[in-house]
């Protein structure tokens, strides 16, 4: 599940895996059922969970009614019994447009705020935590946002099972759970295997954008920036921070973050340094 400390993002999207195309097997732990994890056999590291209890949030009556009225159109859920169920993005959005996937959208505050700034893009928010998705469903319904869709499921499994290779213009991972304890580092979403999987889903020229305010996690990511040969690491060029075009032209879609996420704002108030990472698919 991909998450951020002591917040709804603790229940995000980092349920994760080992690696590759061996048959998927359902894994259960404790008294609760946890998401299926694909077993990959390519020697790379993939985020995974051993035992983890998902927070069970409840919806208000209004949220439940809004969910029932809008989820069939706006949302999908990972079917853990199906190995591959690739989404027809054109049909789902009712148009052909570049698609950006946000892994671990949390409560969707920044997702809903950014979408009107990029109406020419299809945005797919992936989140495991239903109350977080319910808040985003409410915002999309209330504000009439047309370019957001949602998937309830683990981020790695959703990428593996629901998106065709080379079908995405971008992937975003903003403020993932740093899993600070050493014994939990295997749960971090940024791993060699995840980078490989993301690269396989990006089309040539597609962008991977990661942001963190956790210093030790940034060091972890620093060690992996060149780990995936299909991705060219370009850092965070100064001209992009100022809103200029660096000549690549296609970068603006993912770097025009004019609004702070809840966790970014928290980090700034704590005087944490926010580090941004950008890669392009070769």
Curated annotation (Swiss-Prot):
Q: Say yes or no: keyword S-adenosyl-L-methionine present.
A: yes
Read off the InterPro entries from this record: SAM-dependent_MTases_sf, tRNA_(Gua-N-7)_MeTrfase_Trmb, tRNA_methyltr_TrmB_bact
- CDD domains (alphabetical): AdoMet_MTases (cd02440)
Compositionally biased spans, kind Polar residues: 1-23
Q: What does this protein do?
A: Catalyzes the formation of N(7)-methylguanine at position 46 (m7G46) in tRNA.
Q: Which HAMAP family match?
A: tRNA_methyltr_TrmB
Give the CC-aspect GO terms. tRNA methyltransferase complex
EC number(s) stated in the UniProt entry for this protein: 2.1.1.33
Q: What class of enzyme is it?
A: transferase
Full protein name? tRNA (guanine-N(7)-)-methyltransferase
Quick one: which residues bind substrate? 181, 213, 261-264
Which of this chain's residues are annotated to bind S-adenosyl-L-methionine? 102, 127, 154, 177
**Which PROSITE patterns does this UniProt record tie to the protein?**
SAM_MT_TRMB
- Please verify whether the record's keywords include DNA-binding: no
**Pfam families from the entry?**
Methyltransf_4
Question: What lineage, starting at the top, does this entry show?
Answer: Bacteria, Bacillati, Actinomycetota, Actinomycetes, Mycobacteriales
Instruction: Give the pathway listed in the UniProt entry for this protein.
Output: tRNA modification; N(7)-methylguanine-tRNA biosynthesis
């Amino acid at each position: 599940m991909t998450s951020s400390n002591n917040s709804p993002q603790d229940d995000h999207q980092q349920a994760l895996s080992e690696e590759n195309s061996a048959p998927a097997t359902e894994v259960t732990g404790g008294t609760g059922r946890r998401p299926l994890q694909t077993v990959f056999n390519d020697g790379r590291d993939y985020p995974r969970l051993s035992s983890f209890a998902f927070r069970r949030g409840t919806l208000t009556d209004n949220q439940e009614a809004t969910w029932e009225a809008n989820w069939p159109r706006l949302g999908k859920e990972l079917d853990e019994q199906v190995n591959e169920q690739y989404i027809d993005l054109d049909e789902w959005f009712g148009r052909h447009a570049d698609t950006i996937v946000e892994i671990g959208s949390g409560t969707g505050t920044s997702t809903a705020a950014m979408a009107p700034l990029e109406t020419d893009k299809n945005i797919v928010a992936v989140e495991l935590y239903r109350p977080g998705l319910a808040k985003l469903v409410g915002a999309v319904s209330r504000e009439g946002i047309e370019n957001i869709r949602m998937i309830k499921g683990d981020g790695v499994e959703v990428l593996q099972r629901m998106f065709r290779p080379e079908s995405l213009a971008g992937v975003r991972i903003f403020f993932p759970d740093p899993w600070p304890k050493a014994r939990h580092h295997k749960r971090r979403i940024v791993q060699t295997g995840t980078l490989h999987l993301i690269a396989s889903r990006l089309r040539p020229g597609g962008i991977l954008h990661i942001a963190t305010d956790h210093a030790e996690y940034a060091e972890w990511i620093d060690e992996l920036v060149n780990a995936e040969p299909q991705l060219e690491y370009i850092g965070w060029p100064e001209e992009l921070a100022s809103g200029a075009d660096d000549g690549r032209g296609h970068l603006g879609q993912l770097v025009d973050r004019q609004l702070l996420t809840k966790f970014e704002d928290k980090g700034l108030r704590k005087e944490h340094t926010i580090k941004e990472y950008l890669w392009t698919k070769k």
